[in-house]
Amino acid sequence: MLRSLLLLAPLVGAAVLGVRDNSQECPGYKATNIREGRNSLTADLTLAGTPCNTYGTDLKNLKLLVEYQTDKRLHVKIYDADEEVYQVPESVLPRVDGKGGSGKKSALKFDYQANPFSFKVKRGGEVLFDTSGSNLIFQSQYLNLRTWLPEDPNLYGLGEHTDSLRLETTNYTRTLWNRDAYAIPEKTNLYGTHPVYYDHRGQDGTHGVFLLNSNGMDIKIDKTEDGKQYLEYNTLGGVFDFYFFTGATPKDASIEYAKVVGLPAMQSYWTFGFHQCRYGYRDVFEVAEVVYNYTQAKIPLETMWTDIDYMDRRRVFTLDPERFPLEKLRELVTYLHNHNQRYIVMVDPAVSVSDNVGYNDGMEQGIFLQTQNGSLYKGAVWPGVTAYPDWFHPDIQKYWNDQFAKFFDRKTGVDIDGLWIDMNEAANFCPYPCSDPEGYSRDNDLPPAAPPVRPSNPRPLPGFPGDFQPSSSSKRSTKGSKVGLPNRDLINPPYMIRNEAGSLSNKTINTDIIHAGEGYAEYDTHNLYGTMMSSASRNAMQHRRPEVRPLVITRSTYAGAGAHVGHWLGDNISEWSKYRVSIAQMLAFASMFQVPMIGSDVCGFGGNTTEELCARWARLGAFYTFFRNHNEITGIPQEFYRWPTVAESARKAIDIRYRLLDYIYTAFHRQTQTGEPFLQPMFYLYPKDKNTFSNQLQFFYGDAILVSPVTDGSQTSVDAYFPDDIFYDWHTGAALRGRGANVTLGNIDVTEIPIHIRGGSIIPIRSESAMTTTELRKKGFELIIAPGLDGTASGSLYLDDGDSIEQRATLELEFTYRKGRLRVKGKFGFRTDVKINAVTLLGQSAPASKSGSVASFDSGRQAVTIKTSLDLTGPSEIDLN
């Protein structure tokens, strides 16, 4: 949502790093009392000299724990001996079992030097992580560790950012400190924290390094004066809790990461449909009109969304009684449900400090953040003066469940189908120190004035209820607590990370707030606020409907968020640069951070889109997993039906997306079961091809579909890279033999997007599209067989009831094609009336021996299509010769 109010606040420059090289001045540590077991190593680490106390007090006694957790995963943890220093709570990110591995069998090996202490992680004879270049620093408010890297490394990850997918390696700093970041600027910290990087070394494999630490940090990637490459961690606290994992390919490494942070949550079938939203729908009549207009334009609309416009003076858990009265809003939701469509609204964390149910209940239960003197902590957001829920409070889940149960009650409230949570970094418009939130709200017109009330809809909407037609009248630290050391400066730490907003507390919750429950400081847990709201919100949605998969889309995330929620990429703007960077962002979240329900605001959120940009973005957005058009109140309306070319582009885009929806659903389900990514950079499938390592403008949609969008305005061609393999044009069926070079694809109309099927694939598609996913599930299937260079192909299909958390029966099919024969086998538990009605074999120069009504040959597409009537009830085999 637009953050224009931030412009009213005084600007605070980004913090500047210290000028001296601390690692050379500090003594480091020496390892003693070293004990090695079958799958572990422990040691005491003692400060090796005079403390340097550069950005805090050097801790004299540390512990080292090394665990060979699996054959592909190594855990290395350096922490304080008294275990007072804050560690990420297991309630936020549960730890994986570390007892199954063996040092002898592990692909990763841990080596160390005792004095001064340093360590290396090796894979075979190759060094993956080497801290010998500088001394370990472990201070009360500053941790530093540096590792050497190979020359010109292929590094990825360290989100959230809008920089290149393959990270820069000279004078580059990634700052992790979640913030409200309008326009998602480059080279800054954004909404989420994902402290994991992947190092891809071509044919030697890929490894990942995850630092389980939620404190603010700078991660620097640079070269020394003599040209040696390094990566350096600079954190404001916490411990060094590393997970190293390795794989033969990038995909394998991503799978290993999922085992650490949790497998993604499965989503309902309908969530992959098209979604529409806008900040600025003035009333329920306008929302209804948008729904009606999509239907009239014959553009499928699965889910209608409403931003904070529906609220009474922007207060959560309220309705504007004049513009979104309960009775009319319930009528709209009923209309949507009767037409197999859905409805979603936004909920922010900040609760208005005023007489309303959310605030009154929260005060009664004491679940809001408090200052250290026990008074209510207040900020200023859209409704004006606000209080913030304390997600660590022992009663917070009950409070959140109760608010959802009352406001979103199916019989008496707003019966939403999914949830959108925003502003949960947490955002605070009032700059630090926010000593007068009341005055700030008054001076900045918070809440903003609502639009004039319309007594009825100004135009008729045939099919909608009468109400939508025109009216005739018009805790403190103790030893072993792991909650944080005492006597720290929680507002202005000695080391300042490069937070774009300036001081740590600026435009967010004060970092000296102490949470209820265990007594964690906001200083340590700031980056967890959004992900904890996500977990509580998912639980509250599930409490409403225990049997169905809850869709929750969040702005702020932390490592492991995908196990609970999806993510939209925040407040982008309507520019080609944001269109392009959305690809890299999507790939990082889906493949590297294990948050596969992902997408950006199609056509752009801020500013005014153009017809060409929106038409191109409609085609690209159809290949996000989360596909939503959304923009802000000061921009021109940009629903797809507003321009003829955009409407045509959207119809084409959704037609292909919906026909592919079961292919999407199948691959998405696989990721939730194994961690195998669905959306992938090119180098995930061609890990030995160096030309793919920095390609961030093409991507694979599953293993079978290569998408090569036009990425600049006024262009009708794209230079697309095709690895050494065979591909088939989605539209024409023409075979394209890739040679590891660029191919110019021309004459690409603004309503089109280049799509190619990778050889060796079998893709199940629906025989035709539909206006809703409910109707889509009634359509039959076709199989497209795209033989690989060896003449074989394979694919899969997963079906279930599309909604339930616990599935009573599933259909899991495997397709194989070899020597002219198609075989179908698998698990046939889920019953469906639809059949496989046709099989199309690409890459054929002559018709099949079959003739008549059974088979047909298309010489233009070089494809043979055979009509079938295969029930999905048991194994089958077809001769395609």
Swiss-Prot record:
Compositional bias (Pro residues) at which positions? 448-463
Q: Where is the signal peptide?
A: 1-14
Q: Where is this region: Disordered?
A: 440-485
Q: Which residues form the active site?
A: D422 (nucleophile), E425, D571 (proton donor)
- GO CC terms on record? extracellular region
Which of this chain's residues carry glycans?
N171, N293, N373, N506, N572, N608, N742
- Report which superkingdom the organism of origin falls in: Eukaryota
A GO molecular function term, named singly, is: alpha-1,4-glucosidase activity
Keyword annotations of the record: Carbohydrate metabolism, Cell wall biogenesis/degradation, Glycoprotein, Glycosidase, Hydrolase, Polysaccharide degradation, Secreted, Signal
InterPro entries the UniProt entry points to: Gal_mutarotase_sf_dom, Glyco_hydro_31_AS, Glyco_hydro_31_C, Glyco_hydro_31_N_dom, Glyco_hydro_31_TIM, Glyco_hydro_b, Glycoside_hydrolase_SF
PANTHER family in the cross-refs: ALPHA-GLUCOSIDASE, ALPHA_BETA-GLUCOSIDASE AGDC-RELATED
Purpose? Glucosidase involved in the degradation of cellulosic biomass. Has both alpha- and beta-glucosidase activity.
The protein's name in its UniProt record: Probable alpha/beta-glucosidase agdC
Native source species: Neosartorya fischeri (strain ATCC 1020 / DSM 3700 / CBS 544.65 / FGSC A1164 / JCM 1740 / NRRL 181 / WB 181)
What taxonomic classification does the UniProt entry list for its organism? Answer: Eukaryota, Fungi, Dikarya, Ascomycota, Pezizomycotina
Q: Which gene encodes it?
A: agdC
